[in-house]
Swiss-Prot record:
Keywords: Elongation factor, Mitochondrion, Protein biosynthesis. Residues 387-406 are annotated as: Disordered. It comes from Malassezia globosa (strain ATCC MYA-4612 / CBS 7966). It holds the Pfam family EF_TS. The lineage of its organism: Eukaryota, Fungi, Dikarya, Basidiomycota, Ustilaginomycotina. The keyword Mitochondrion applies. The gene is TSF1. HAMAP family: EF_Ts. GO terms for biological process: mitochondrial translational elongation. This is Elongation factor Ts, mitochondrial.
Length: 406
């Protein structure tokens, strides 16, 4: 009788082991699920595949059902987590810039800038957080209609509450993210569930392609981001849009008037026949110079504490010129960020203000004194609008204090 016990024990172990092997999700299904939802852990992928199996096929993996289960679980967990961390301060994060068209390569400038906040710099450097900022900025660039429609402003601040309900448009469209469309709010909630910190969309600005142009003029945008903590994952499929992020960023609209806009902003500027190669090459060179000028202006706005395009009055302009090192008006600042590719003499950035340099560039390349002007700009820094109670420390401060770094 005692001799039979080891045999029975082995039989039970064999049956249990066989049962576990039959119900364990396959490596292929786990890999497919993690590819569809980057950042999903092995344990969470296995749990999702097991929990989403059909009663009629308890041993069959269903990746689509697992994706739906994960999204539903994250939405529920994220909502609970959001309620728990709602009172926390989000003074860290990143500012994302997405440009669909700069108005030079193709007519109609279209771009957006967003500030996505979190509690700690650690999360701000996370790839999942960076990818979310990229997708939200891309969505904002596609949705200028949510900006205030009763204004003729070239660059508009978007109502964040309305924007959160928009369907998110992934920066990289692929087969892996073809599952159910979700809103910007839901995408943020999902990331809260995955990262465990409060994540909030601070502000959104969008450049509408039809708002700045008028007869005989064209709109060009320039952008620049500085102090990038971590770049989001590179897209696996080619995309026409560009993205940049950083702790300080600027987005501005440049309006081009006169012969220059008619020559190089038309749809036919780059589609001339071979007998016009000389003119086409000249137009291409002018485009490169204009793009470099717009880039220089964006660098200038980001590099200085810029708050406006120009001083509000002539008296203020004189005062700003007298102390241009701290001037908040872009046009009164010394143009120290001017790139050589813009086509002006390098000494210009040491001798002239931005206003003088633009006038010189207009006379040289645009064919008229007022051929180019800065129509609007935004310059943001991470956390500058964060409200913190005077008697409360942030989660980031608590972490630093616990680590002895405060």
């Amino acid at each position: 009788m005692r001799a039979m016990r080891p045999v029975a024990h082995l039989a039970r172990c064999f049956c249990a082991s066989s049962s576990v092997k039959e119900t364990r999700p396959s490596i292929q299904a786990i890999a497919e699920l993690r590819k569809a939802l980057p950042g999903t852990s092995m344990l969470k992928a296995r749990e999702a595949l097991t929990a989403s199996r059909s009663p009629d096929a308890p041993d069959t993996d269903n990746v689509e059902a697992a994706i739906a289960w994960l999204e539903q679980t994250r939405a529920s967990d994220g909502a609970k987590r959001e309620a728990k961390v709602a009172s926390r301060v989000t003074a860290e994060g990143t500012i994302g810039l997405c440009t669909l068209s700069d108005g030079i390569s193709s007519p109609g400038a279209r771009a957006a800038m967003v500030e996505l906040n979190c509690e700690t710099d650690f999360v701000a450097r996370n790839d999942i957080f960076g990818a979310l900022a990229r997708d939200i900025a891309h969505t904002a660039a596609w949705f200028p209609i949510v900006a205030a429609s009763e204004t003729s402003a070239v660059l508009s601040d978007v109502d964040v509450a309305a924007f959160l309900e928009c369907p998110i448009i992934p920066f990289e469209a692929s087969e892996e993210n073809k599952h159910d469309v979700i809103s910007v709010r839901a995408a943020i909630t999902s990331v809260v569930a995955r990262l465990g910190e409060k994540v909030a969309l601070g502000r959104v600005a969008s450049l509408a392609p039809t708002s700045g142009g008028s007869h005989g003029s064209a709109l060009v945008c320039g952008s620049f981001a500085h102090g990038t903590a971590s770049a989001p994952p590179a897209p696996q499929t080619p995309v026409a849009a560009t993205f940049a992020s950083g702790r300080v960023a600027s987005l501005l609209a440049v309006q081009v008037h006169g012969p220059l806009s008619q020559r190089i902003m038309s749809r036919t500027a780059t589609t001339q026949h071979n007998d016009h190669d000389h003119d086409r090459n000249g137009d291409d060179e002018r485009k490169r110079q204009l793009r470099a000028l717009a880039r220089s202006l964006a660098r200038q706005a980001a590099g200085f504490p810029t708050t406006s395009v120009d001083a509000p009055s002539a008296t203020a302009a004189v005062a700003s010129d007298a102390s241009s090192e701290t001037s908040g008006a872009l046009l009164t600042q010394p143009f120290v960020m001017l790139l050589p590719a813009a086509g002006l003499d390098p000494s210009v950035n040491e001798q002239k203000s931005v206003r003088d340099a633009l006038e010189l560039w207009s006379n040289t390349y645009a064919g008229q004194a007022d051929g180019i002007r800065v129509a609007a700009l935004r310059r943001w820094e991470v956390g500058e609008t964060a409200a913190r109670p005077s008697d409360e420390t942030s989660f980031a401060d608590q972490v630093k204090e616990a680590a002895g770094l405060a």
